[in-house]
């Protein structure tokens, strides 16, 4: 069986066209990531003595690590005079002031404000804010318990368990991680490549009428169908994993650092309400797994659509249309209160920021289940149903073809 899976994988997914697309899409993704860095980072002004890039990393050596009152005082001792000097907007705009770090007072203030003061303030204040959320949830749980509202009590208890004790004890550079976690372009490339690769899995056999011959071969029929499904699964998982980790490598190479991966994911502002208590690196691994689950479920849907056609063009168009419908519905519900819609749409697992970045629950049998956890179960169940349909319908479809030929 392993040899048959290997044969199907090489035959279907090691074609020159697929390998060429793999290379082209990977390069396009890396160029896009580098473009994000050049467009949005303020540390791209070269490596001169007075550049933001050089000064930032010099200051970072001083302030990184555990947030202490001593570090805060040192930072404010530099920052506060700059605020006072520039608050009325009458300070000199000269760019060669020898008494400044960057050559300009306003530039000095902006550098410290963006990369040190604001992040450190957010880190310092976050524990207090999360503790307030936890306390309110605990009070709500007690109140709902008195009223006999069991589900609401359980939901409030789950929120308390998530937010109690959240802290960001250390200061670290977070810009690279911020852009990485909010990057979606590779998802489009993953879907296009997976669609192009999987859509011909059954079509090629029907085009040459090999599907009828397989019925009487030793490894034909359902055994070959199972091998095709497993080979397609392997292709979908490898493609999804490749782009997930290519994103991380691309951002780390562009920003020239892996700094920030040890921070908790809620150190990124738009993940302040994250439904997981993980480090950013752990989040990367979870995100990759969720993307694999989403890509696999959508891929099985494409396989089911394609198995009834002799020409690849029509199922490709149909698969692309299905994909666009999932994307459109996912985008429409991404930041809405339609939690069930997000959980049922496998595309949400690909753009899992909308699931993991918010603490949202759905009611399953009176128990609050986080939307990302529910989405995994729904995707796996849907995928297994699709696999079963492909497995049993494939042989039946071939028998009908044989009867028509007779």
What are these regions (language model features)?
Residues 1-19:
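Aromatic- and glycine-rich beta-strand/loop motifs that create alpha-glucan
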